[in-house]
């Protein structure tokens, strides 16, 4: 009995091996590959258990289990757009939208800055400056005293400041650091979590930041004289005395109105990733202070260095259309400066802007990100990438998958043929790769052409001279010079009985083009060849064989003229590109 049990186990293992290498339906006509050996554990198979009955549930089903209904079909067409084209589109589309987003009323950058200035008890200009940055030595200082931008050593001001550096200058003024600094945790996070910064200004979040800011203003008085002395070293003698009054000026009492003026894109970096695109925009925004009172200053200007990080992914409505979607956007105010732009006498008392303490842009960052998240009118919209019009014709295409990779955008489509009054599913197949260095490419599976020809053949039966002819088999082959060879067999009956079998070869030249998502057909019948079995019936069936060839070619030619291709992306289409007939009989065009 144990011999039978061991044999049953061996059979189950062998059956499992066959299931693993079962040929998929889409490649059923290809040569059958040799079975792939099982990946067995290093220690070998466990010895069979000989006690008890055989577990018949281990045996695989005799027939392959069909895929569940509603599953995705195999792709029958593909559209490709290179990463260079995507980069060019974003570089031309994003800058004006990002600049408008910074100016957007619902983001309210100027209002948030005013709110922050109103949270401190002592808001004279000298108290709001970044004292550590102004006093620090090294290169890059705008006043010639180093460290003007508030970065450590030779730090690059164009790079986003980390959370520790955002409060570093102020923290050094307060023994033991800034109390409540933990409230800034995650404030400057530019990616991933869409809710970054959310809730920071609600509850006790703002109070934890406001308190150290007020404490810092009180403690900074110890170095005010040193700051003022350093600033006076770089200004003309004629404005030193008025400047002292300016530095003691209370911003809250003098600013009547703030408004975002000019927004300039300094640089933009686009990274293509496996699941989308990351866009980092570096900007400079000026915020003008109008209506300033006093005998010296008539116009103030704040300058904000900002980063805007945007995540862009593919959005599909599971029909024919694929678009780009700006899914996540975060703003980061890296630093803020104040510029004394204009005086009553027309003189500019300071040659460069003075940096504000870095806790101020940190709080502004949190506030504007909350506003952006709640906004309905400040979002980035990329709907001009694809107009998403329905594409009707001989074939209906539906998006199978769409993804972005470092190479570019790839859209795979399922297809159905609309022939006569019925819809015929087009079986998918393995598609050839896109041409190297292609910017745009469209590939149509050979299964679409085969589906078209087979459906045409069903409507090409002929009756004449007491004979009836019907096409029973079709084969395809690609020839040189973009030529397609179609071979079909014809069953000829006489008086209801089989009389002869004819074979016809059609040689068709293919010179079609694709332009603006439209196939411009150009197919010509070069020649045809006929043969008959048995040969003695040739003379009697030559007429009907010739007629079948004429009807089949006419039907194919008229139907092929209605053939359409997937649109892909309407803003990036092929222009008068030749359609190449591949050896696999797939159709491909590229530019």
UniProtKB/Swiss-Prot annotation:
It comes from the Eukaryota. One of its GO terms (biological process) is sensory perception of smell. One of its GO terms (cellular component) is extracellular region. Expressed in lung. Not detected in other tissues tested (at protein level). Keywords: Glycoprotein, Secreted, Signal, Transport. It is found in: Secreted. N-glycosylated. The N-glycans consist mainly of complex sialylated and fucosylated biantennary structures. The keyword Transferase does not apply. Glycans are attached at residues 421, 516. It holds the Pfam family LBP_BPI_CETP. The keyword Transcription regulation does not apply. Residues 1-18 form the signal peptide. This is Vomeromodulin. InterPro entries: Lipid-bd_serum_glycop_N (IPR017942), Vomeromodulin (IPR034433). Residues 151-172 are annotated as: Disordered. GO terms for molecular function: lipid binding.
């Amino acid at each position: 009995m144990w011999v039978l049990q061991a044999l049953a186990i061996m059979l189950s293992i062998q059956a499992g091996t066959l299931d693993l290498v079962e040929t998929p339906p889409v490649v059923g006509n290809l040569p059958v590959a040799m079975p792939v050996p099982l990946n067995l554990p290093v220690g070998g198979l466990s010895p069979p258990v000989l006690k008890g009955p055989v577990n018949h549930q281990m045996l695989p089903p005799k027939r392959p289990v069909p895929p569940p209904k509603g599953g995705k079909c195999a792709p029958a067409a593909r559209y490709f757009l290179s990463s260079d084209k995507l980069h060019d589109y974003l570089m031309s589309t994003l800058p004006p939208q990002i600049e408008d987003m910074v100016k957007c009323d619902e983001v309210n950058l100027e209002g948030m800055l005013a709110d922050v200035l109103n949270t401190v008890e002592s808001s004279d200009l000298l108290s709001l400056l970044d004292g550590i940055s102004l006093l620090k030595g090294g290169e890059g200082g705008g006043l010639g005293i180093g460290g003007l931008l508030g970065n450590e050593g030779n730090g690059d001001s164009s790079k986003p400041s980390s959370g520790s550096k955002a409060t570093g200058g102020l923290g050094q003024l307060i023994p033991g650091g800034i109390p409540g600094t933990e409230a800034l945790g995650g404030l400057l996070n530019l990616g991933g979590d869409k809710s970054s910064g959310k809730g920071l200004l609600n509850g006790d979040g703002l109070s934890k930041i406001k308190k150290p800011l007020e404490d810092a203003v009180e403690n900074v008085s110890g170095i005010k004289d040193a700051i003022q002395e350093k600033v006076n070293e770089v200004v003309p003698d004629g404005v030193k005395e008025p400047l002292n009054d300016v530095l003691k000026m209370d911003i809250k009492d003098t600013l009547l109105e703030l408004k975002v003026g000019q927004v300039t894109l300094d640089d933009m970096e686009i990274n293509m990733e496996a699941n989308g695109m990351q866009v980092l925009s570096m900007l400079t925004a000026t915020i003008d202070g109008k209506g300033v009172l006093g005998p010296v200053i008539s116009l103030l200007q704040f300058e904000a260095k900002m980063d805007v990080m945007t995540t862009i992914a593919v959005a599909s409505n599971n029909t024919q259309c694929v678009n780009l979607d700006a899914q996540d956007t975060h703003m980061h105010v890296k630093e803020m400066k104040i510029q004394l732009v204009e005086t009553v006498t027309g003189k500019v008392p300071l040659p460069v802007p003075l940096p504000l303490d870095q806790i101020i842009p940190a709080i502004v960052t949190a506030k504007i990100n909350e506003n952006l998240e709640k906004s309905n009118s400040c979002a980035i919209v990329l709907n001009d990438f694809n107009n998403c019009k329905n594409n009707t014709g001989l074939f209906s295409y539906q998006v199978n998958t769409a993804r972005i990779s470092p190479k570019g955008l790839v859209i795979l489509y399922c297809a159905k043929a609309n022939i006569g009054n019925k819809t015929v599913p087009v079986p998918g197949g393995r598609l050839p790769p896109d041409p190297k260095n292609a910017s745009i490419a469209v590939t149509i599976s050979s299964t679409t052409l085969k589906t078209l020809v087979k459906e045409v053949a069903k409507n090409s039966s002929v009756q004449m001279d007491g004979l009836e002819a019907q096409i029973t088999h079709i084969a395809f082959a690609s020839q040189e010079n973009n030529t397609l060879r179609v071979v079909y067999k014809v069953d000829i009956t006489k008086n209801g009985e089989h009389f002869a079998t004819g074979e016809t070869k059609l040689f068709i030249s293919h010179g079609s083009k694709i332009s603006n998502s439209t196939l411009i057909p150009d197919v010509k019948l070069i020649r045809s060849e006929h043969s008959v079995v048995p040969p003695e019936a040739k003379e009697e069936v030559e007429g009907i064989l010739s007629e079948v060839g004429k009807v089949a070619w006419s039907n194919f030619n008229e139907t092929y003229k209605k053939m359409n291709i997937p649109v892909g992306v309407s803003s990036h289409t092929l222009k008068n590109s030749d359609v190449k007939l591949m050896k696999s009989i797939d159709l491909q065009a590229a530019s």
